[in-house]
Every structure is written in C-alpha cells, then in structure tokens.
Design a protein with these regions (language model features):
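PEST-like low-complexity, intrinsically disordered acidic/proline/serine-rich tracts
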Residues: 1-137
C-alpha cells in the first residue's frame, strides 16, 4: 500500500484520486458507465464505483500484469478475467482500505489485504522527484 500522500476529489460523476507517488491520477466513475471495448490494460485499470453509506466500493478491470507485483510483490496475471474490488471507508480521522484481488490464474480464492491512512485535511500533494542529495547517492 502506498505510503505517499493521496488527495481525494469527489465530483458529481466521478471520484478522482491524486497520488503524490509518480503523480498518478486515478478516476473512479460513479455514473454507471462501463469500460470501452477497446480499453487497454494499465497500472490503474478502469474503475467504476458506488457508495454504500460511508464506503466507496470500487471494481477495477483492465489491469496490466505489472500492477500488483509493483505494489506488493504478489503475482498478478492481468488476464481479461482478473479484477479487483476495493472498499474505502471514511471515519472521523482515518481512511480504511480493503482490496480483494480476483485472479483465477494464480488464486483459487480472492487475495485480500487491508490498510489504513490517517486523514490530514490540511495536507498537500508535493512534487514527486528523486533528488540525489536526498537519496544518499
């Protein structure tokens, strides 16, 4: 799970995640749309979501094979029948995260993991750069 700051912007038809790490932008469509037929696999995939009270439930398809390996080291096939279901639950001071990875190529049952973040309403996304003077090189 990414330790870098994350900004969440809720709009009428989507929720946008701005990740400091590699400046990644993730759009979670909440208007019922489905992935276009010609959508290609990417690290972020194609995400659709809906709200269940204070929990954003997100299903992501079209994930590239590098996705899970990059984050956790766990194998991930990226086959057309793979997908994730994530739950983001907001409390007074935390964002709780649970993900289920559905990949029949590698797992007989969904692979599940959870994590949490402390909410920092005044936090800011900063430039993500690798500076030699800060890396010890």
């Amino acid at each position: 799970y990414d330790p870098y700051p994350l900004e969440i912007i809720q709009q009428e038809h989507q929720v946008v995640f701005l990740h400091e790490h590699f400046h990644m932008v993730r759009r979670i469509f909440t208007d019922g749309r489905q992935a276009p037929e010609n959508w290609w696999p990417t690290l972020g995939g194609f995400s659709v979501g809906h709200w269940e009270e204070d929990t954003l439930v997100v299903k992501t398809t079209h994930l590239s094979p590098e996705n899970l390996v990059w984050h956790t080291g766990m194998p991930f096939s990226g086959a057309p029948d793979t997908y994730t279901v994530e739950r983001y639950t907001f409390t007074d001071d935390r964002l709780m995260y649970t993900a289920e990875i559905f990949d029949p190529t590698y797992y007989e049952e969904p692979y599940v993991f959870s994590a949490g973040r402390v909410l920092a309403p005044d936090g800011m996304i900063l430039e993500y750069e690798c500076y030699p003077e800060y890396s010890g090189f």
